[in-house]
């Protein structure tokens, strides 16, 4: 039977404490999802905490699968350079493959996106295919699987039909 339990964290050092997460496993088999999702994040943000911290956390988790989902915010950048974006993605995916060598790596491309702003819509139309191509190429180069979520939604502009049906 499920019981309610209380978790208390106390600082024993007297300094600033930053809790990055908690691992509360039941001991029963199942799927553990550990997300570092940040609303508005871009691909470069995954490197911000520092590689050594990421390596330690991935080592403790010992994941069977690492899923990386980026591109939706990146494609809204007016200064996006596809070659630099692909190089950054390739570097990050290469590091993840090294940091979790036993894990399969899955990269999901961005969902189709639209904007009420004409300027942003033009920017997305220009950047979306480049971001998807860069992520696909970087994933393949890192030995990762790639899923094109925009194609699964129905392709370019499909988000509008999803929105009309109140699905997006």
Roles of regions detected by a PLM:
Residues 84-87, 91-98, 130-137:
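Alpha-helical scaffolding segments of alpha/beta enzyme cores, especially the outer helices
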Residues 69, 108-109:
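Alpha/beta-hydrolase-fold catalytic nucleophile elbow
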Residues 51, 112-168:
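Catalytic His-Asp segment of secreted/periplasmic serine-dependent ester chemistry enzymes
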Residues 27, 38, 110, 151-154:
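Residues that form or immediately flank small-molecule/cofactor binding pockets and catalytic motifs
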Residues 98, 102, 154-155:
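Secondary-structure boundary motif
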Residues 1-94, 114-116, 165-167:
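Conserved SGNH/GDSL esterase-like catalytic core that processes O-acyl groups on lipids
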Residues 31, 61-66, 100-105, 141-145:
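Loop/turn elements at helix/coil->beta-strand transitions in domains of secreted/extracellular proteins
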């Amino acid at each position: 039977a499920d019981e309610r339990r209380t978790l208390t964290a106390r600082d024993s050092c007297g300094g600033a404490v930053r809790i990055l997460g908690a691992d509360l496993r039941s001991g029963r088999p199942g799927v553990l999802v550990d997300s570092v999702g940040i609303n508005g994040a871009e691909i470069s943000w995954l490197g911000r905490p520092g590689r050594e911290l990421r390596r330690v956390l991935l080592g403790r988790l010992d994941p069977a699968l690492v899923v990386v989902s980026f591109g939706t915010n990146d494609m809204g950048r007016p200064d996006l350079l596809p070659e630099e974006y692909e190089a950054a993605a390739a570097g990050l995916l290469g590091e993840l493959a090294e940091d979790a060598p036993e894990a399969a790596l899955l990269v999901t491309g961005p969902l189709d996106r639209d904007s009420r702003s004409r300027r942003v819509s033009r920017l997305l139309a220009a950047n979306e295919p480049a971001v998807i191509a860069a992520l696909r190429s970087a994933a393949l180069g890192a030995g990762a699987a790639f899923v094109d979520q925009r194609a699964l939604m129905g392709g370019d502009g499909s988000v509008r039909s999803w929105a009309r049906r109140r699905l997006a």
